[in-house]
Amino acid sequence: MAIILGIDPGSRITGYGVIQRAGRQQQYLGSGCIRMQGDALAPRLQQIFDGVSQLILQYKPDMFAIEQVFMAKNPDSALKLGQARGAAIVAASNQGLDVAEYSARQIKQSVVGNGNAQKSQVQHMVTFILKLPGTPQADAADALAVALCHSHTNENLIKMSGQVKKTVRGRLR
C-alpha cells in the first residue's frame, strides 16, 4: 500500500490530490486547493511551502509527484510557476520524500490515454477512475491526475523490474 500526494503548482492556486494505491486499486483520500493571499510573491511562496508541508504531515504520503513547468506565453508567468514548484518541492524534500516530476502530456496520456486531452476530459477520467461522487475543481483534478500518473508509472516500473529479475540467460523465468 502506498499513499501518493500529487501537486498541480501555481503561484495563486496550487492544487493537491491524495490517493492510496493498494495493488492495482486506487482510492481517493482527499483533494483541494491551497489559495495564496496577497500580491507579493515571497509570502505566496511561503504559503505554498507551509501548505504542502501541512499536507505531508496530515496524509503522511509515501510518494510525492508534481507537474513540470510548461512553456508559458508570458516568461514572467513561467518564472513564477517555477518558483511555486520549487516551494512545493522543497517542502517534500524537507520531509524526506523523493520527488517525481511529469509533464502535462505524460499526465494526460496516463490518465486519459491522449497526451493532448482537454482539461474537461482529465476531470471526467479522474472522477471515473476514483469513483468520485462529483467532479473536483480543475486544479484539484489536475493534482489527482498527477498522483494517478505516478501510481501508473510506478506500477509499470515495478512490473518491469520484476521481469528483469526473472530473466535468466535471455529467457523470462
Swiss-Prot record:
What is the recorded name of this protein? Crossover junction endodeoxyribonuclease RuvC
Q: How is the cofactor bound?
A: Binds 2 Mg(2+) ion per subunit.
What this protein needs as a cofactor is: Mg(2+)
- Organism field: Pseudoalteromonas atlantica (strain T6c / ATCC BAA-1087)
Keyword line: Cytoplasm, DNA damage, DNA recombination, DNA repair, DNA-binding, Endonuclease, Hydrolase, Magnesium, Metal-binding, Nuclease
Keyword Hydrolase assigned: yes
List the NCBIfam families hit by this protein, alphabetically: ruvC
Organism lineage string: Bacteria, Pseudomonadati, Pseudomonadota, Gammaproteobacteria, Alteromonadales
Q: What is its main location?
A: cytoplasm
- Cellular location(s): Cytoplasm
Q: What does this protein do?
A: The RuvA-RuvB-RuvC complex processes Holliday junction (HJ) DNA during genetic recombination and DNA repair. Endonuclease that resolves HJ intermediates. Cleaves cruciform DNA by making single-stranded nicks across the HJ at symmetrical positions within the homologous arms, yielding a 5'-phosphate and a 3'-hydroxyl group; requires a central core of homology in the junction. The consensus cleavage sequence is 5'-(A/T)TT(C/G)-3'. Cleavage occurs on the 3'-side of the TT dinucleotide at the point of strand exchange.
| Quaternary assembly | Homodimer which binds Holliday junction (HJ) DNA. The HJ becomes 2-fold symmetrical on binding to RuvC with unstacked arms; it has a different conformation from HJ DNA in complex with RuvA. In the full resolvosome a probable DNA-RuvA(4)-RuvB(12)-RuvC(2) complex forms which resolves the HJ.
Q: Which Gene3D superfamilies match?
A: Ribonuclease H-like superfamily/Ribonuclease H (3.30.420.10)
User: Which biological process terms from the Gene Ontology are attached to this UniProt entry?
Assistant: DNA recombination; DNA repair
Query: Sorted alphabetically, which Pfam families does this protein's record hold?
Result: RuvC (PF02075)
